[in-house]
């Protein structure tokens, strides 16, 4: 299945719909919710499925999609638990390193893979396990774990950049998995010709605003991190996206209207002597 069609991604269409913002938001959200509900219904009807693997690049909407999937599954009589692969990071001091000595948090080997296998084995065999939580402020796994106990016909949603990587999935029973890949898969065009915002830049704008509002990151810090983020996606995600059973386009056309003022304001703050000035002006 590929849920990517029937999207009018012309700038002129967006500008027209923006005149009725509430209706535009409802239209975009409705489209995405229907996709999630269709998938949830199919999962609920297939009793063999016990684990949903949900992968996507940075700012594709993994956490939001996992939340919506849980809600949609519940409507279909199936409870679920969400597990983030980010909580299986090795402590920063144990992380793999680039040749210059800086930590490589994008590689799949930045995760404690044997521990992930152990947790998933416990869930599948006993129905319960202690789930770790990673503290990104300290760069360490928290001492406290979250205990989960699943009942019959409950589903685990594992979300993360590496959720489709065979290194992560090879120890899991393939006949009990359902794999989802999400990404912004539409560009914004001017009259169907010139690209005014490509797919990767759309995700960057999402991340730029998110990191500023919720993580206290400057524009330059986000631009600096984006270099390694892109490396991680190109190396550890995109080669495995075709392993998915379903691919979903997570673009919400109204978001360009919502994010533009904050994004432009932030990008204008980059000084002319910055190494990121040219890129900020382009965006």
Predicted regions and their residues:
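Charged, amphipathic alpha-helical linker segments immediately N-terminal to NTP-binding catalytic cores
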Residues: 1-38
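Conserved NTP phosphate-binding and transfer environment spanning the P-loop NTPase/kinase superfamily
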Residues: 21, 33, 170-283
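Hydrophobic anchor at the beta1->P-loop junction of P-loop NTPases
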Residues: 52-54
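P-loop (Walker A) phosphate-binding loop of NTP-binding proteins
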Residues: 57
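Conserved glycine(s) of the Walker
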Residues: 61
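Hydrophobic positions on the alpha1 helix immediately C-terminal to the Walker A/P-loop
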Residues: 64-69, 84
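Post-Walker A helix-loop "phosphate-sensing" segment adjacent to the P-loop in P-loop NTPases
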Residues: 71-81
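Conserved nucleotide-sensing/catalytic segment adjacent to the nucleotide-binding pocket
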Residues: 81-83, 90-139, 155
């Amino acid at each position: 299945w590929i849920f990517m069609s029937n999207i009018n991604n012309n700038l002129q269409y967006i500008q027209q719909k923006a005149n009725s913002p509430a209706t535009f938001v409802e239209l975009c959200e409705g489209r995405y919710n229907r996709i999630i509900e269709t998938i949830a219904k199919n999962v609920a009807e297939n009793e063999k499925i016990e684990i949903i693997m949900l992968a996507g690049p940075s700012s594709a909407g993994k956490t939001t999609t996992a939340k919506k999937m849980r809600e949609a599954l519940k409507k279909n009589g199936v409870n679920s638990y969400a597990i983030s692969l980010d909580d299986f990071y090795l402590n920063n001091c144990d992380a793999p390193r680039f040749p210059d000595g800086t930590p490589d948090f994008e590689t799949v080997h930045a995760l404690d893979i044997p521990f992930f296998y152990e947790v998933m084995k416990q869930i599948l065999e006993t129905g319960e396990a202690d789930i770790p939580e990673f503290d990104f402020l300290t760069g360490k796994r928290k001492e406290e774990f979250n205990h989960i106990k699943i009942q019959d016909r409950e589903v685990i949603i594992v979300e993360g950049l590496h959720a489709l990587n065979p290194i992560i999935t090879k120890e899991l029973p393939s006949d009990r998995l359902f794999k989802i890949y999400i990404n912004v898969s539409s560009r914004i065009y001017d009259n169907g010709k010139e690209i005014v915002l490509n797919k990767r830049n759309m995700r960057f704008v999402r991340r730029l605003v998110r990191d500023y509002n919720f993580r206290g990151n400057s524009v330059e810090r986000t631009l600096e991190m984006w270099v390694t983020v892109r490396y991680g996606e190109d190396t550890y995600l995109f080669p495995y996206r075709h392993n998915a059973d379903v691919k979903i386009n997570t673009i919400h056309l109204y978001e360009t209207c919502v994010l533009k003022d904050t994004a432009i304001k932030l990008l204008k703050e980059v000084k002319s002597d910055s190494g990121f000035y040219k890129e900020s002006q382009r965006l």
